[in-house]
């Protein structure tokens, strides 16, 4: 008999009466009055092994095994005694009567129990190998595998070709810092790890491969946020001779296919499409969570002439905004709740949080409860009540500041209230999946510090055809042929139609204050390629880590990556990054300069 004939978790009634050979890890050992029970675990699940003292040598071995010993069991599959069936296990109707037990490798005492759900992330990442043995992590990584397989199946059927692009490439400005790799052969010069395969996949379209994809690692040396990793995985795609709508349709179908085949979820037959300007106006975010039913009400124009400077000053400012958020039944919120929300919005730059409780709308001013009502005239109060559609028992929150602060703070408050226990109890948030496309993004953003425009996405995104004329005269008016797929408030994919004409690409570089000499030095290979009959093309990249996190219901993308980094970009398992010896540095012609310590 071979070392293993079956997986533990797949031993069921169909094997009754058969002798099997199993390999796995001891989940738990129990001694019940002379009979030893072992819960044996492998990647497919658990099976109960019964060790009877009638087989003395085997029983002596069983007495010595402990949690996480790696063992081999040979035995007979039989029904469990009446009353001992475990309906929670796939193998719960049977057990294996052990004939032979071999310890393949003992284990020292693990630093934690695998069923402990209260472990710190530091402990889990330091002992990642043991953490990965836990059923939830096994499930997550197998789900990740299935998502990747289904993406490949779909793309293969659609005629896409899997082509690898370089990991050592040229450093080009794409927003975040590059991870640099020194060249030993070319002293003083550096490769960069790719932030994305963006330029290479465009070159593949010029080279007539028509449809490309790869599931690939990307690298960004940026300040990490809660769900960012210095290295992450993209489902990266590019296609020729398709317009924006056709590209969106193609990849919308892919996401529907993946969700249906991996977690049996039917996404909307047609994803709604929302312009960027509408998303910002209604939700203060370019990735709105449509499960939350709350929306902004625009009040900027109505507050320009009020005596209340907190509202009128931003209402009259060039970059100011005044917006309201009506919360149905919110009048029941306590002053403590409101104070908590006030502190919360300060995180996003808000100076405070104005509010009005609507107790009896019919009484006008007298039916309102708020510290700000006395500062507003009747016409402005009427405008607030009419525009928000407020009813008795509602509360209205206000934000008045620079538009960015209003959008960030009130948008975060919208999500916090919607997903709170209050929000759930009052039907302010729906369950399920709410996908949408956000389109018509600004092509450029103005950088006040550098006094110039920067690319909102990347400098290879095509402007809308009707906005080509603004590239040189008024870049701020340009909208891009860019699109993001958003799901439950997460951007899971983003892409665009690309610039395929050299003259347009050069105009975009000039709008970004990238001169001809700099453009040639950094992007000459692209500009040259575009002159050889480059086809119209576009594409998209999906964040595999993020998609799997959502599907798994995980708390963090670190729960769906086998060996992730911490928020400080450290690998606690291998202790990377780490110093290297002086000889290696000399070979690379590098001398370290330690960062200056701040004066005490």
Curated annotation (Swiss-Prot):
Coiled coil: none annotated. It is found in: Cytoplasm. The record marks 32, 83 as: Important for tRNA non-discrimination. Gene3D superfamilies: Bira Bifunctional Protein, Domain 2, GAD-like domain, Nucleic acid-binding proteins. It catalyses: tRNA(Asx) + L-aspartate + ATP = L-aspartyl-tRNA(Asx) + AMP + diphosphate. Its main location: cytoplasm. Keywords: Aminoacyl-tRNA synthetase, ATP-binding, Cytoplasm, Ligase, Nucleotide-binding, Protein biosynthesis. PANTHER family: ASPARTATE--TRNA LIGASE, MITOCHONDRIAL, ASPARTYL/LYSYL-TRNA SYNTHETASE. Aspartyl-tRNA synthetase with relaxed tRNA specificity since it is able to aspartylate not only its cognate tRNA(Asp) but also tRNA(Asn). Reaction proceeds in two steps: L-aspartate is first activated by ATP to form Asp-AMP and then transferred to the acceptor end of tRNA(Asp/Asn). NCBIfam families: aspS_bact, PRK00476.1. Homodimer. This is Aspartate--tRNA(Asp/Asn) ligase. It comes from Burkholderia multivorans (strain ATCC 17616 / 249). The lineage of its organism: Bacteria, Pseudomonadati, Pseudomonadota, Betaproteobacteria, Burkholderiales.
